[in-house]
Amino acid sequence: MKSKVNFLKSLIPLFLVTYVCSDSFDNNFYNNHGSVGLINIPTARFFNEEVHGITIYDGTPDQKITLTSNPYDWFEASFFYPNIQGKPYPGFEYQDYKDKGFNLKVRLKKEGQLPAVAIGLNDFAGTGFYSSEYVVTSYGVRNI
């Protein structure tokens, strides 16, 4: 019984750090592309203004480093540089494919009684390997 109590006590700092971090970022997370979203899906949520981040994604077949900036609470811009394994770089037999690109996201409507609405462009200035355009809505239920 004492070992279970000690184990639960050891989890308290973890829960405190999680609470503080999630509260300071309004429950937003970076997705695989380095922008606010869930896994590989963008959301209409944004970090507070003047929040900047660096993300490193190590998946298969691609790895990606992304620099993201939120100069305003309604605008997000990011620059990414991926390495795609198994796809040869043109003219180099033993080199993986490299790319670069930029992402933009702009909020059109803030969340209230209706969902937040944003539009975005992925990889609009690169080779277009990750290219996409989207309109997305997000609505939080009970601050989730």
Feature map (PLM): residue ranges:
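Transmembrane beta-barrel domains of Gram-negative outer membranes and organellar outer membranes
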Residues: 23-132, 140-143
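Cleavable N-terminal export/targeting peptides
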Residues: 1-33
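Conserved, mostly hydrophobic/aromatic
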Residues: 137
